[in-house]
Regions:
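Residue-level detector of conserved, well-ordered beta-strand and adjacent loop positions
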Residues: 19, 53, 73-74, 140
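Catalytic-site neighborhood detector that most strongly recognizes the C-terminal catalytic loop/helix
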Residues: 9, 22, 57, 127-152
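Conserved tyrosine-mediated DNA breakage-rejoining catalytic core shared by Y-recombinases
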Residues: 3-62
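Short, surface-exposed helix/turn micro-motifs that flank interaction/cofactor sites
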Residues: 2-3, 124
Length: 155
């Protein structure tokens, strides 16, 4: 998310293209411990095109920057992933919600998509997973309420 630039967003076609990733890696120079690097995603399936829902376009238009600016920072330099987590934690605290990691939003998104009836293969591709097993086993979490609804369908 932190590696996305406006050049990766086609508002007319409503497509977001994931073509790079930002990560903190260990330095081998002995001077600094870690550094931020932008690289290609870890697998071919991680490189992907994601349809943007129509209702999101007005929000993106409101914040749209030049093609070299990053979506999250609004600048030509990316937001440090740790900064994103810190800001997310601060928002959760301010609205009295339990602390969770920012990455948990991917899990919540996947579970919600399944509850809404998304095809697992399509969801797996949206998430950039190499297989539906990764999506189902690591990202999709069933709720007890959902189980109640399923069981009530039995007659």
């Amino acid at each position: 998310l932190t590696a996305l630039q406006w050049q990766d967003v086609d508002l007319k076609k409503r497509i977001l293209t994931v073509r790079k990733t930002l990560q903190r890696i260990q330095c081998q120079d002995g001077v600094t411990k870690t550094k931020l690097v932008i690289t290609e995603p870890k697998s071919e399936s991680s490189k992907r095109k994601i349809p943007i829902p129509a209702h999101v376009i007005p929000l993106l238009l409101k914040f749209q920057g030049n093609k070299n600016e990053y979506l999250i920072s609004g600048k030509e330099t990316p937001t440090e992933p740790r900064t994103l987590q810190y800001r997310f934690s601060k928002i959760l605290k301010n609205v009295n919600l339990p602390s969770v990691h920012f990455h948990s939003l991917r899990h919540m998104f996947a579970s919600r998509c399944i509850r809404l009836g998304f095809d697992v293969k399509a969801l797996s591709e949206i998430l950039g997973h190499s297989s539906v097993e990764i999506t189902l086993n690591r990202y999709v979490h069933s709720s007890f309420e959902q189980k109640i609804e399923y069981m009530s369908r039995l007659k």
